[in-house]
Structures are given as structure tokens and as C-alpha cells.
Amino acid sequence: MQTPGLPEEKPAQGCPFGHGAVASSVATPAADSGDGWHDAQLDFSESMSYGDYLSLGTVLDAQHPLSPDHNEMLFIIQHQTSELWMKLALYELRAALQAVHRDELPPAFKMLARVSRIMEQLVQAWSVLATMTPSEYTAMRPYLGSSSGFQSYQYRQIEFLLGNKNEQMLKPHAHRADVLAEVKASLEAPSFYDEVVRLLARRGFAISAARLERDWTQPTVHDASVEAAWLEVYRNPSQHWELYEMAEELVDLEDAFRQWRFRHVTTVERIIGFKQGTGGTSGATYLRKMLDVVLFPELWHVRTML
């Protein structure tokens, strides 16, 4: 009941993060009440916990060092977490490709931006691995056998999805029929950029038939008709805003990918110099050659033409 002459009292409101508990108007010390702690659920015997949801038992039990060296745990976790980020990158890129195929560009922009941020995360991860010295790596290297990041089938699918196709890169996966089928499907399917070039054609640009009907298993090469289309987009961005935004999202993505490649080669040089890689490649020399790969050639060359 309201007391005459006094302002009306408002009913106490429950904290939106308090699981329905009514907020007290008097501050109380943060202490264990005996029945719980800050209203948090503490009994998960009949409900799903954080660890259950994330399958942490499986994830955190997936590190099996083969050497007695302390630093091998870093090496394993560096690569396992990178594979998890690559899984998400593939998930987003494939969804973005399908969105472009349906002419739904705004969702594709969000997904591409997310992939670029994933690449930035992967770039920063090299700084952690770079804390391993040559002496530390030498102690554990014999235990790696011929295993190498060169054999990462998720990374290979990202390369293929971004247009850097090479049929020879199927061979490292021939011993796993399931993986081989997955990587081969990525090789034979149109790349993300191929789908964007199709989009240009659907938007009325005169893309050559040879470009639209090319062999999807081959790497992306410069095409004059595609560059002419992008030149028109960049000269009149307000008239082709979605295509303009798509172009810039792709440049952001390749820029981040180039940074990842650069940090990869410098980290390898820092740790093993110019020794042969465990997978049989020339190591840093091979990685330096990969720095010259251009994924979206017309988008870079058009800047010179403007």
C-alpha cells in the first residue's frame, strides 16, 4: 500500500542475468550463501555443462606428445588450434559461396569479413610458435617423422576454394580415401572467385565465355574481361555498390592470407633456417615461392589501371 504523501514504490525487478532472482536494493558482500555462489547453477548432474557442450574431454585429451621434450605440447596445440580455425574458415567460405550463388550478397559479406578476422587470428598465432628456439625444435624434430603442415587437408581445401588449384596436391592424401574424396571435390568445384566472376556476368558484365566455362581444376589466371568488369565497378562504385563491396572484401581476405603466408615463412626461417621441411619440401625456400601466388589477380591489377 502506498503511504500518503510519499512517492509510489516500484516493485523490485529481477536482474536479467540473475536467473529470476529479485535484485536487492541493498548491496551485499560477494559471499557464498551456503546454498550457492552468486545465484550460479552449481549442480550439473542432470543438465549439460560447459565442458559437455564443448566436448572438452575429447578436445583436451587430443594432445599426445611423442617426445620427452617440454616444448612439443606448444607445437601440437599451435597446429591443432590452427586446424580448428581453418575448419571455421572453410565453413564460412562455403556458406558465403552458396550465398553468392543465390545472389544474397549481404550475408556473404559478413561471412567473408569473419574469414578475414580468422586469418588475422591465425597470423597472430605464429607469434606463440616463434617462442620456440632452434635448439628446442631440434630436440623434438626426430619424433615428427614425415608429418608436416604441408599435408593439412583443410588448408589444401582453403587454397582450392580460393582458387589456387593444383592436382598434384591430391597425392599426399591418397592414403585416406575419405579425405582424398573431400579434397578432390574442392579441386573440381568452382572456387569462390569463380562464383564471383559468374556474379559479374549475371549483373550484365561481358565476361568471356572461356572464363565462364574454364576448367575448374586449374588455378585462377588473369582474364581481361574480368578486369574490365572490375574497372567499371571501381570507376562507378555508387552504381555497383554491392560488387564494389565484394571486391574490397576479397582484397581484405587475400591481404590477410598473404600476411599469414609471410608470418609462416619467417617463423620457419627463425626456427629451422633453410633446412628441408619434415614433409620433404625445401622448407622456407618453398614457402617463399608461395608468397608470389595471387588469388584474385584482376582485383590487384585494376588498381594500377585506375
UniProtKB/Swiss-Prot annotation:
Function: Heme-dependent dioxygenase that catalyzes the oxidative cleavage of the L-tryptophan (L-Trp) pyrrole ring and converts L-tryptophan to N-formyl-L-kynurenine. Catalyzes the oxidative cleavage of the indole moiety.
Membership in a protein family: Belongs to the tryptophan 2,3-dioxygenase family.
Pathway per the UniProt entry: Amino-acid degradation; L-tryptophan degradation via kynurenine pathway; L-kynurenine from L-tryptophan: step 1/2
Enzyme's top EC category: oxidoreductase
InterPro entries the UniProt entry points to: Trp/Indoleamine_2_3_dOase-like, Trp_2-3-dOase_bac, Trp_2_3_dOase
Amino-acid positions noted as binding heme in the UniProt annotation, renumbered to this chain: H264
Co-factor requirement: heme
EC number, as in UniProt: 1.13.11.11
Reactions mediated catalytically: L-tryptophan + O2 = N-formyl-L-kynurenine
Annotated keywords: Dioxygenase, Heme, Iron, Metal-binding, Oxidoreductase, Tryptophan catabolism
One GO term of the biological process aspect: L-tryptophan catabolic process to kynurenine
GO molecular function, one term: heme binding
Subunit and interaction comment: Homotetramer.
UniProt protein name: Tryptophan 2,3-dioxygenase
Matching Pfam families: Trp_dioxygenase
Binding site for substrate: F75, I76, I77, Q78, H79, Y137, R141, T278
Entry's cofactor comment: Binds 1 heme group per subunit.
